[in-house]
Design a protein with these regions (language model features):
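Flexible, glycine-rich active-site loops centered on histidine and acidic residues
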Residues: 127-158
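Short beta-strand segments
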Residues: 78, 109, 134-140, 166, ...
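Conserved beta-ketoacyl condensing-enzyme motif
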Residues: 4-6, 47-106, 219-242, 248
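Buried hydrophobic positions in well-ordered alpha/beta secondary-structure cores of metabolic enzymes
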Residues: 4-6, 32, 61, 75, ...
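Claisen-condensing/thiolase-fold acyl-transfer catalytic domains that form or cleave C-C bonds
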Residues: 51, 55, 81-82, 100-102, ...
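Condensing-enzyme catalytic core mediating Claisen C-C bond formation in acyl metabolism
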Residues: 1-46, 148-205, 209, 213, ...
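Short acidic, glycine/serine/threonine-rich loops at helix termini
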Residues: 15-16, 87-88, 146-149, 298-302
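Acidic-glycine-rich active-site phosphate/pyrophosphate-binding loop
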Residues: 25-32, 85-98, 135-142, 187, ...
């Protein structure tokens, strides 16, 4: 049985305060705290690239669990901001870390739904190829493509990375996953000519419309109710989006963690960062992991504790 054994993450030390940009964007303290829910964003160093963020997360993982580079059978990186257009970021990482040459590697081009998709892909690939240990990285440094004069993006997105160890000794396993795509709205979150554009209102409306019913359908087909879930790990798009989804689901606030005031929306890393913080909390038996955004795309997973 394959599943999540351990998670580690890295958030750069450098911060840019949103309070220092109130006058520039004509915003208030209340807007910062309650609407976007990001007081400062994390920004990578100028000499850090996507692979470097992955390496930092991997170093954190090795501090938590004994793992040999020879044990890694699969290396997958979820990113849409790679080091280069080609080769794949995972290959660069394999070379930098000196992992065995029999280690399979590939990238997944997905944004905020990427962690949930990645879990399914990695676990299925490993099972099909009789692999024992795999690493799922999420790293999407949006500071590479953000216009610092754009209110809709520069106040929200922060840099960060996470690595999830998938093995035959899991803490959480995937019970079921649902997926969705709304490609007709792709221009609501798009990078053109190297600059990110986001229709903030459009993305919020999309998430609030599509995510809650999809979660309810997922629960229903597994004979579960809202009350059977201990934590709802909702992609940390903004305070407004997370709160709105929780209200639509009629879930009490303590079941829906929100934790990006200090570093911002880390795209595909936001869910594993949340999950890492409850991984060893045995009172949490079953969680929903919900990712949504670029595509437009969404994916919801039921994760169940097995130890």
């Amino acid at each position: 049985m394959l599943g999540i054994e351990e998670i580690a993450y890295y958030v750069p030390e450098r911060r840019v305060s949103n309070y220092n940009r109130k006058e520039k964007f004509n915003i208030t303290d209340e807007f910062i705290k309650e609407k976007i829910g990001v007081e400062q964003i994390a920004v990578k160093a100028d000499n850090e690239n996507t692979t470097d963020l992955c390496l930092r997360a991997y170093d954190k993982l090795k501090e938590k669990i004994q793992i040999s580079s020879d044990e890694i059978d699969l290396l997958v990186v979820v990113t849409q901001n790679p080091d280069y257009s080609l080769p794949q970021t995972s290959a660069i990482f394999q070379g930098k870390m000196g992992l065995k040459t029999s280690c399979a590697s590939f990238d997944i081009s997905l944004g905020c739904s990427g962690f949930v998709y990645g879990l399914s892909i990695v676990q299925s690939f490993m099972a099909a190829n009789k692999m024992k240990k795999g690493l799922l990285f999420t790293a999407d440094p949006y500071s590479k493509i953000i216009d610092t004069d754009d209110k809709n993006t520069s106040l929200i997105f922060g840099d960060g990375s996470a690595v999830t160890l998938i093995s035959e000794n899991p803490i959480f396993v995937t019970e079921d996953i649902s997926y969705g795509t709304s490609g007709v709205d792709y221009k609501d979150l798009i990078c053109e000519n190297g600059v990110l554009y986001m229709n903030g209102r459009g993305i919020a409306n999309f998430a609030i419309k599509e995510v809650p019913p999809d979660i309810l359908n997922l629960l229903s087909r597994n004979n579960l109710t809202i009350r059977d879930i201990d934590k709802y790990l909702i992609h940390q798009g903004s305070r407004f989006i997370v709160s709105s989804i929780a209200k639509k689901l009629d879930v009490e606030e303590e079941k829906v963690p929100y934790d990006i005031y200090d570093y911002g929306n880390t795209v595909s890393s936001s869910i594993p960062i949340l999950l890492e913080k409850i991984l060893k909390d045995k009172s949490v038996k079953r969680v929903i992991a919900s990712g949504f955004g670029v595509g437009l795309s969404w994916a919801n997973a039921i994760l169940t504790r097995v130890r």
